[in-house]
Amino acid sequence: MGVMEILVSTLEAVPGYRVAQVLGVVKGSTVRSKHLGKDLLAGLRTLVGGELPEYTEMLQEAREVAEARMLEEARRLGAHAVLGVRYATASVMQGAAEILVYGTAVRLEPARER
């Protein structure tokens, strides 16, 4: 038996389905910091401007970890979907950031046609 796929959406509804049960808010977070060497390289890049790929990569990885943690919580609840998903980022200390992802875990059923 495979892992149940859970729909993740910023929408509040899923076309063709209705929310049968609201299971509650689910969330996932992680705090990440950059390696000192990469931090120095990124600091040098700020002098000339442009994207800081070291931080872009770190934040992308952190979002993936936070989302996986949120989905694990949704899976434990038996959710079919997590709706209204939002991401938040906060600096927790010099060189470290928290990524938080949250939404509403729901069970869905096909919408009845009228």
UniProtKB/Swiss-Prot annotation:
InterPro entries: UPF0145_dom_sf (IPR035439), UPF0145_YbjQ-like (IPR002765)
Taxonomy, superkingdom: Bacteria
Pfam family, one: YbjQ_1
Family listed: Belongs to the UPF0145 family.
Protein name: UPF0145 protein TT_C1581
